[in-house]
Amino acid sequence: MRLFGKYLWILFKAQMQYRASFWLLSFGQFFIPFSVFAGLYFLFERFGQIRGWEFFEVALVFGVIHMAFAIAECLARGFDMFSGLVVSGEFDRLLVRPRSTVLQVLGSKFEFTRIGRLLQSLIVLVWAVAQVEAHWTLMKAATLLFMIVSGTMIFAGIFILMAAMCFWTVQGLEVSSIFTDGGREMAQYPLNIYQKWVTRFFTYVIPFGCVNYLPLQYILDRSEGPGFLYMLMPLAGCLFLVPCLLFWQFGVRRYRSTGS
């Protein structure tokens, strides 16, 4: 962690060399998601509810998912841009260093400008928490925190999976956007509004359902069974990260340099 902190400090100083650009990008990241949230607001303004879900209930999920995505984009941006390291041959240099390749790729890129998106998501989340009809307890507050952490782990895991594919494809695949940007757009709504096969895929394969739908049921007092099970449900995101890292190690062992 100490080494990772040094990576962050170096990257922060590098980005602050162009302060005007940094702040403009941060402001852009703050305002761009407002168009998405405005669409959500007008949707509920027109129809009132969707499959029994009220506006502030969905806004709570919106805030959680977009905050998780913003944090994952900040931390795992190196994996999102990993194909450049493979194409240029820079990954060869990482392999000869006595440090984890995961740590080095994490430290190769960090998007501090995503703090704008993070702040916007936090504002929406605080507003939704204040307005949603829920009896808040310490366990429910912890569940909300676990939802954010788990969502971050899931998005980071997807970035790692897509980066690992570059060991075979060299160039990054645009199909990854289906699971990153597409996953963010899909998971900002409770999963039960979709077809059953979609719900099952995003519960048992990529466990977004364990981040938004199931714990949200507990927070809104609509769950059945012990509350602590729903509280721990978001931790499935941490488990999702394990096979992603194993696949990364599998790819590293089969890496062949491009010769650049």
Regions found by a protein language model. Give the residues of each.
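Hydrophobic transmembrane alpha-helices and immediately adjacent juxtamembrane helices
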Residues: 1-260
